[in-house]
């Protein structure tokens, strides 16, 4: 039996804490591809694509034939070669594509039906993916193709859990961007999961046993969702103020309630307690003819409940807004830069160390451990996105009816919308500076310096998703958050498919040297500064509009003696 929204709100801290842990262990684990790749090679996936040259024996590691022949090596008794790398990288491309692209239909479904069913489906798909990899490892020569299906289900299931967890911050009010960043930080840190599994694997535990146990743990996610997540979507702070201490059962609708339903119910009750219908209807007609709002309490509730259609932009209007379009450019460039590095990291390291597999394995483990930085760094962007918003909220909550002299002496407060845009501009500018720094370190063929590249890669990956999520939550209606985030993820995932031809170009014509690919990606990453530059211009536009409104209010006050333009006389 699914709990009510009121029950879910009481359990919000438990749900948030478990969601962070579940994201860490079961969401975007494919981001730890470097460690999984080593284990798949050691288990013989697509090893049959490699042919052993005559001058290579079983004891040779990294042995090469004559210059005209392909380089091969042995890993745990299985052959490893370039053809195997290309096929497994293609499987990673498919899985990482679904990890992002599936968010559009997920967002549409979640906005309409809520996160519960999607989270149940995601945990089940993740468990099936683990079992498929384990089954493929039992007969790799015949069942290697299962890795494509398994990684596809892994990406789909992981994104279901990640995406549904992004609705939980709606229950935390002004801290919503911070909690979104925390969820995204745990999602980004899930890249540490496969390095952790690799440590268990290196300790001698069977690969199949590890995956079966992991699939069983995914069942716990299913049970947690079944008993704690409600059927209805979580209403945003603008739709429901959870801080109001009221028992919904007093009003008779504790079972299913959203912000709009609450106001509708209160309006209905208000009508019954109001003045006679004949008196109210006459005033309504006069007000509608003259274009004014009514001050009657019951009608005022209804009037204030209806402007959502006028205030909230349509979905298509949001899609073609400059902020969304420029955020797509930023995400496409950043996603391609990050995904290419994750997919090609082992080969890049192998090029730097001339094929030393032990050193490659060591640096891959270091990269995996550093993914935990996302849990610490991602909330920083969320904090930047929430910077001083509480002061703006306090300003809007002050009583409106004050003397003119008191109004002039009152301390000037920040405009909430302008503060949101300012925070987003700072977040994206800082993130893109780090992305450019990451591109510069990738150009330097120095092995110890790659640790700095690992750190910058991890920080940027956590920052960019947190910044985009916080921007969408701040600028667009909560009912469009899932669809817009899904659209952004789909387009950036399609663009990130270019990482496969870039990988083939690096391994083929460039003979494993990533220099020119990194140069091109560095130049492309400069496009990410378009969004913060536009946000600067947009902020100035909002400031001019605010100044004009303030001047109009002063003029109205001077003429009428009151700043209330909604009074009906």
UniProtKB/Swiss-Prot annotation:
Its main location: membrane. Belongs to the SLC43A transporter (TC 2.A.1.44) family. It catalyses: L-leucine(in) = L-leucine(out); L-isoleucine(in) = L-isoleucine(out); L-methionine(in) = L-methionine(out); L-phenylalanine(in) = L-phenylalanine(out). Detected in several tissues with higher expression in placenta, kidney and peripheral blood leukocytes. In the kidney, is detected in epithelial cells of the distal tubule and collecting duct. In the intestine, is expressed mainly in crypt cells of the intestinal microvilli and epithelial cells in the base of the villus. The lineage of its organism: Eukaryota, Metazoa, Chordata, Craniata, Vertebrata. Disulfide bonds: none annotated. The modification Phosphoserine is found at residues 274, 278, 297. This is Large neutral amino acids transporter small subunit 4. The keyword Membrane applies. Residues 395-416 are annotated as: Disordered. Affinity and transport activity are regulated by a phosphorylation switch state at Ser-274 and Ser-297; increasing of affinity and amino acid transport activity via dephosphorylation at Ser-274 and phosphorylation at Ser-297. It is found in: Cell membrane; Basolateral cell membrane. InterPro entries: MFS, MFS_trans_sf. Changing residue 297 to A: Abolishes sensitivity to N-ethymaleimide. Severely decreases phenylalanine transport activity. Decreases affinity for phenylalanine. Strongly decreases glycosylation. Strongly decreases expression. Reduces membrane localization. Glycosylated. Dephosphorylation at Ser-274 and phosphorylation at Ser-297 increase affinity and amino acid transport activity. Phosphorylation-dephosphorylation cycle is regulated by food-entrained diurnal rhythm and dietary proteins. It holds the Pfam family MFS_1. GO terms for cellular component: basolateral plasma membrane; plasma membrane. Changing residue 274 to E: Slightly decreases phenylalanine transport. Does not affect membrane localization. It comes from Homo sapiens (Human). The chain crosses the membrane at residues 20-40, 90-110, 120-140, 143-163, 177-197, 203-223, 323-345, 365-385, 435-455, 462-482, 490-510, 516-536.
């Amino acid at each position: 039996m699914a709990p009510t929204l009121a029950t879910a709100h009481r359990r919000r801290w438990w749900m948030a804490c478990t969601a962070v842990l579940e994201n860490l262990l079961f969401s975007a684990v494919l981001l730890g591809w470097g460690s999984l790749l080593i284990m798949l090679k050691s288990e013989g996936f697509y090893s049959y694509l490699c042919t052993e040259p005559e001058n290579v024996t079983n004891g040779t590691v990294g042995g090469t034939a004559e210059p005209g022949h392909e380089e091969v090596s042995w890993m745990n008794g299985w052959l490893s070669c370039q053809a195997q790398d290309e096929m497994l990288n293609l499987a990673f491309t498919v899985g990482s594509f679904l990890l992002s692209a599936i968010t559009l239909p997920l967002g549409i479904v979640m906005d309409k039906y809520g996160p519960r069913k999607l989270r149940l489906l995601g945990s089940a798909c993740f468990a099936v993916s683990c079992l498929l990899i384990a089954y493929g490892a039992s007969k790799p020569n015949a069942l290697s193709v299962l890795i494509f299906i398994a990684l596809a289900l892994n990406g789909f299931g992981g994104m279901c859990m990640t995406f549904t967890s992004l609705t939980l911050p709606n229950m935390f009010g002004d801290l919503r961007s911070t909690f979104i960043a925390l969820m995204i930080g745990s999602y980004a840190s899930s890249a540490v999961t496969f390095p952790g599994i690799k440590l268990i694997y290196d300790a001698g535990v069977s690969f199949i046993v590890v995956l079966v146990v992991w699939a069983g743990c995914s069942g716990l996610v299913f049970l947690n969702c079944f008993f704690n997540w409600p059927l209805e979507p979580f209403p945003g702070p603008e739709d429901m103020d959870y801080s109001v201490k009221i028992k919904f059962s007093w009003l008779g609708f504790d079972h299913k309630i959203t912000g709009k339903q609450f106001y509708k119910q209160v309006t209905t009750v208000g009508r019954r307690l109001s003045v006679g219908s004949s008196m109210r209807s006459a005033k309504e007609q006069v007000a509608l003819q003259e274009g004014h709002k009514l001050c009657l309490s019951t009608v005022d509730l209804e009037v204030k409940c209806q402007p959502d259609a006028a205030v909230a932009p349509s979905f298509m209007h949001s899609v073609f807004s400059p902020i969304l379009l420029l955020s797509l450019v930023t995400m496409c460039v950043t996603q391609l830069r990050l995904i290419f590095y994750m997919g090609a990291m082992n080969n890049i390291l192998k090029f730097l160390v001339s094929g030393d597999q032990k050193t490659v394995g060591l640096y891959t483990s270091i990269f995996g451990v550093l993914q935990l930085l996302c849990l610490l760094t991602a909330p920083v962007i969320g904090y930047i996105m929430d910077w001083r918003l509480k002061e703006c909220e306090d300003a809007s909550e002050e009583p409106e009816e004050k003397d003119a002299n008191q109004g002039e002496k009152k301390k000037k407060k920040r405009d909430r919308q302008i503060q949101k845009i300012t925070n987003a501009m700072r977040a994206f500018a800082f993130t893109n500076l780090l992305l450019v720094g990451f591109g510069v370190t990738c150009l330097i063929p120095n092995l110890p310096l790659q640790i700095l590249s690992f750190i910058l890669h991890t920080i940027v990956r956590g920052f960019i998703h947190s910044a985009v999520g916080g921007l969408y939550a701040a600028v667009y209606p909560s009912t469009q958050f899932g669809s817009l985030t899904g659209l952004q993820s789909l387009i950036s995932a399609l663009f990130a498919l270019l990482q496969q031809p870039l990988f083939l170009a690096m391994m083929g014509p460039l003979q494993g040297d990533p220099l020119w690919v990194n140069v091109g990606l560095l130049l492309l990453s400069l496009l990410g500064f378009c969004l913060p530059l536009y946000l600067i211009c947009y902020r100035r536009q909002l400031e001019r509009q605010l100044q004009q409104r303030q001047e109009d209010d002063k003029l109205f006050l001077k003429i009428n003696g009151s700043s209330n333009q909604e009074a009906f006389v």
